[in-house]
């Protein structure tokens, strides 16, 4: 493995996560935040600061449109995941991290 690939892998070992929660997804947000704390993954403060965009719950049409605009502002490598149930949290985060590492390749 070359130096650049190692640096990319290291940088994405703890991806910065930006959460977008739909109305009535508070419990789901708590589940995701608890899992992020357990993993030691930081929350992003803006699209420019994120690697992994996670949409919680089912956004309505207006929020979905806003999420698309937000997504367009996230730089590569990036990954967008949707979480509908607390049981999906770990799988979504693991899949997102794996996809980021592949894309950074």
Residue ranges: model-predicted function:
Residues 1-8:
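Short N-terminal or domain-adjacent regulatory/targeting segments
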Residues 8-105:
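Cofactor-cradling patches in redox/metallo enzymes
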């Amino acid at each position: 493995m070359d130096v650049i690939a190692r640096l990319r892998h290291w940088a994405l070992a703890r991806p910065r996560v930006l959460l977008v929660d739909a109305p009535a997804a508070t419990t789901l947000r708590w589940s995701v935040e608890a899992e992020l704390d357990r993993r030691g993954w930081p929350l992003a403060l803006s699209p420019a600061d994120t690697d992994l965009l996670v949409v919680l719950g089912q956004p309505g049409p207006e929020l979905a449109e806003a999420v698309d605009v937000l997504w367009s502002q996230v730089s590569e490598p990036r990954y967008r995941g949707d979480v509908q149930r607390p049981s999906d949290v770990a799988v979504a985060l693991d899949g997102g991290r794996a996809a980021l590492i592949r894309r950074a390749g």
